[in-house]
Structures are given as structure tokens and as C-alpha cells.
Amino acid sequence: MSPRMPNPSLVVPDVLPPMRALVKAVNSVGVPLKTLVLIHLRVSQINGRPVQIPKKQAEFEAAGEEDHRLPVVETWREQDCFTDAERSCLALAEAATRINDREDPVSDEVWEEAAKHWNEVELGAIVLHIGLVNLWNRVNVATKQEPVDWRINPKKWTPMTSRLAQAQAQPAASSSH
């Protein structure tokens, strides 16, 4: 798949720095990174955004992964390896992503279960994280951006990092509008 254009966050002036700042703020309130990763993966799965994750123990170890639950996130309800707090986030992520599936997409039951495990600031960060993942999924799908390898440690997201660096080095295409 060849991208239709560079990532819009690199093309539109002054967009990427505030988006990065928002991600940094969301990541700094105390929700464990592993929980945010589970949310990111589940939202991307729902949106049909391909995510390349290791499928075998040896691949996890070679990649330096710590969380061997990633391949079973799609079937989290049937798994016993997720905490109640993580389950509440996955349910909230599904509900907030599938907003057209039912009349009341995020039911009081889903919200109240999440609120049992997270304080208001953490819950706000989780909701914002869900929204940000949905935003990035839609941008990437619309512009046919290539999926990146999935890594728990953001420093290991080298395919995206190298693509961003390459795109930033190239001048943006001028518009005739």
C-alpha cells in the first residue's frame, strides 16, 4: 500500500506539536502505559486498522516485549489474563469507538464500571486516549498510511519514527487553493 500523501499532521503547519503535547499530557496522569497500549490496540482492531503484533512467545522475547496478552486483546472478554480495571477500559474503548452500534453507545453500566477503577483525571485521560486513537486511525485510513509494528515501548516504534523523520525532512507539497 502506498500512502496517498504524507501524514496530514506533518503537512498542516503547527499541528504535530500540540498533538504530541496532548498525547504527553494524557500519558502523564497515572494510567499505566500497558493499559493505554491495550486500549490503543483494541480501538485500532475495531476500526480495521491493521496492527502488526508478535504472535509467538519467541517473537515477543526477540522484540523485547513484556506483555504477552496483546494477541488476545480482541477476545478479552473470554480471557482471564486482564485485570478488572483493564477490562473496564476495554469495554469503554469499545463503546466509545462503536458509537453507531446502539442508541446509548456508552451505557451508564460501562461508565460506572470504569469509574470504579479510575479517578476522574484518569478517566478523563482514558476517554481522551480513546478519542486520539480514533483520530489517528481515521487519518491513517483516509491517507492510506502504512501500519507500524506494535511495541509497548514507544521508543521501539521505529517504523513510525523513521517515517516521521523522513516526512519532516521533505518539504510539504504546495497547494494551489
What are these regions (language model features)?
Residues 1-177:
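Hydrophobic alpha-helical segments
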